[in-house]
């Protein structure tokens, strides 16, 4: 087994990943004879942006929708619609919401970018709320791309889907005055406000859905959402928000240009911390899920495995992935129908010292908690992360406690944190209910230099001192901060010390790669 090795996002030779449910081979692009229709690009973007004049008139906000949707609707099962560069070098298509078809693949060719409309009316579900933030919590925006009960469908290719989250809206209350991300940032200013922004991709029900090689960027809201699928393969994809088109290199935005500092007008520069609720990959109530050889940098959870209804989520594998800005490879917060049999293998996290950076995380609370069990993390390299390890049953304060979280049989083996200039060893959170203690095994978990702060005050209704209500099993390999855990902790904590070895930390010497080395659109 190979741990903490840098991989290209899409390999050129055939490769495979071994999962608990079998061997999953790298997907492949459709053969030329399987293309039912090629749809040429019509737009000429410059530096990742369409000229504002292209869709300043709301009546021309989505000129390519009909061509793309018609091609999908008329494509036979087992074939693909291919979006290609135009005859005069055009590389962009501009569309509103489109619906995928069961058995049909959308192929976005290399050099092609699908741009989303910035007209909220194109997405509005009939409530007239899309593109604003208010106290109404009802879903009001259709996603850019959607599908229901899809079987053997997918999105493949080396092209890009761009949600244009940093572009100024053209209709509604915020026309000419806010971008999608300005709207989203209002939820940061008031907990009572809901943003009404579209997701990039939302698939409900079905089986055997494939994402291969595609870049998803600048979503106004969550990027990739799945609910109730059996069989999802995401291989060699990239999720990037904000892209270089909406920021400066290194996210070095000037004061007064970002949503948190702008005064009286829309923001013109964005950072991961100011593009709220832009989750990367969210499989909910789904089984047989694989994400491999992929790259994610965003403003919220890199991954959020959820189980809020149905039969829960089980049989998940995350292998050979690179994470950058974001809130971690997470489970939760909805776990009430259960998450089980999940493996994270060969994970690399570089949090860039963001104040919101997280490594691996299981989160829930007593309003939406359930059993999370059989979760293994192995071969993890981390640096520049504020919270490298989070196992928190008190993710938010629960007024009505009816669904308690229970985290059992959690294993972390081969975890190496190389430290942070801003946060040293960062924070390690272990918090559970007395009736449902956290059961976690740590083996060869090592921090260079400063050790993580594990003893801390409680939060959101947790016990007053953490760690609390946790059974730790150490070994057989060294746990570098075990002594601190044993000396300072809250109530309900027990230790089983089975350390018999002093192995070298996981080798992270070649693990970290700049996102810009695999994507020219990346600012980092």
Q: What would you call each of these model-derived segments?
A:
Residues 1-97, 101-102, 110-205, 212, ...:
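Extracellular "leader-to-stem" segments immediately downstream of a signal peptide or signal-anchor
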Residues 68-74, 91-102, 117, 155, ...:
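Short, T/G/N/S-enriched strand-turn elements that build extracellular solenoid repeat scaffolds
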Residues 97, 144, 200, 223, ...:
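Structural detector of coil-to-beta-strand junctions
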Residues 110-111, 151-160, 207-217, 230-244, ...:
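Right-handed parallel beta-helix
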Residues 166, 229, 286, 301, ...:
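Active-site beta-loop-alpha junctions enriched in small/polar residues
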Residues 196, 248-250, 274-277, 304-305, ...:
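Active-site-adjacent structural elements in folded domains
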Residues 354-524:
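Extracellular beta-rich repeat passengers
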């Amino acid at each position: 087994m190979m741990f903490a090795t840098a991989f290209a996002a899409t390999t050129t030779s055939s490769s495979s990943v071994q999962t608990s449910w079998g061997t999953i081979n790298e997907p492949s692009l459709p053969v030329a004879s399987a293309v039912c229709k090629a749809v040429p690009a019509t737009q000429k973007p410059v530096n990742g942006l369409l000229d504002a004049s292209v869709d300043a008139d709301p009546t021309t906000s989505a000129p390519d929708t009909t061509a793309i949707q018609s091609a999908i609707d008329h494509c036979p099962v087992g074939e693909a619609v291919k979006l290609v560069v135009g005859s005069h070098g055009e590389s962009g298509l501009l569309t509103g919401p489109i619906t995928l078809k069961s058995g049909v693949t959308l192929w976005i060719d290399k050099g092609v970018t699908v741009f989303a409309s910035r007209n909220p009316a194109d997405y509005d579900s009939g409530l007239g709320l899309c593109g604003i933030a208010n106290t109404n919590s009802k879903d009001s925006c259709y996603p850019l791309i959607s599908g229901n009960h899809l079987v053997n469908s997918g999105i493949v290719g080396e092209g890009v889907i761009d949600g244009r989250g940093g572009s100024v809206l053209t209709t509604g209350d915020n026309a000419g005055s806010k971008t999608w991300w300005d709207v989203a940032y209002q939820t940061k200013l008031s907990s009572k406000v809901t943003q009404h922004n579209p997701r990039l991709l939302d698939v409900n029900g079905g089986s055997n859905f494939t994402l291969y090689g595609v870049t998803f960027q600048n979503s106004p809201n969550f990027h990739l959402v799945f609910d109730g699928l059996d069989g999802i393969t995401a291989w060699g994809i990239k999720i990037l928000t904000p892209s270089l088109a909406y920021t400066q290199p290194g996210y070095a935005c000037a004061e007064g240009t970002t949503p948190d500092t702008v005064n009286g007008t829309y923001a013109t520069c964005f950072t991961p911390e100011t593009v709220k609720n832009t989750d990367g990959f969210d499989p909910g109530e789904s089984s047989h899920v694989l994400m491999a050889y992929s790259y994610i940098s965003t403003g919220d959870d890199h991954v959020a495995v959820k189980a809020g209804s149905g039969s829960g989520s089980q049989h998940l594998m995350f292998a050979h992935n690179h994470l950058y800005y974001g809130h971690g490879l997470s489970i939760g917060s909805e776990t009430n129908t259960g998450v089980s049999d999940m493996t994270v293998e060969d994970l690399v996290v570089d949090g860039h010292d963001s104040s919101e950076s997280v490594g691996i995380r299981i989160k829930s609370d007593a309003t939406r908690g359930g059993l999370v069990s059989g979760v293994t993390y192995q071969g993890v390299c981390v640096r520049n992360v504020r919270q490298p390890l989070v196992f928190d049953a008190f993710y938010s304060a629960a007024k009505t406690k009816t669904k308690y979280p229970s985290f059992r049989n959690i294993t972390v083996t081969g975890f190496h944190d190389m430290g942070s200039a801003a946060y040293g060893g960062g924070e390690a959170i272990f918090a559970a209910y007395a009736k449902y203690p956290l059961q976690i095994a740590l083996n060869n978990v090592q921090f260079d230099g400063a050790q993580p702060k594990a003893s801390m005050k409680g939060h959101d209704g947790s016990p007053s001192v953490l760690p609390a209500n946790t059974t730790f099993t150490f070994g057989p390999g060294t746990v570098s901060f075990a002594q601190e855990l044993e000396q300072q902790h809250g109530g309900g904590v027990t230790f089983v010390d089975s350390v018999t070895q002093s192995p070298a930390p996981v080798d992270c010497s070649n693990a970290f790669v700049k996102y810009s080395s695999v994507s020219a659109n990346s600012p980092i």
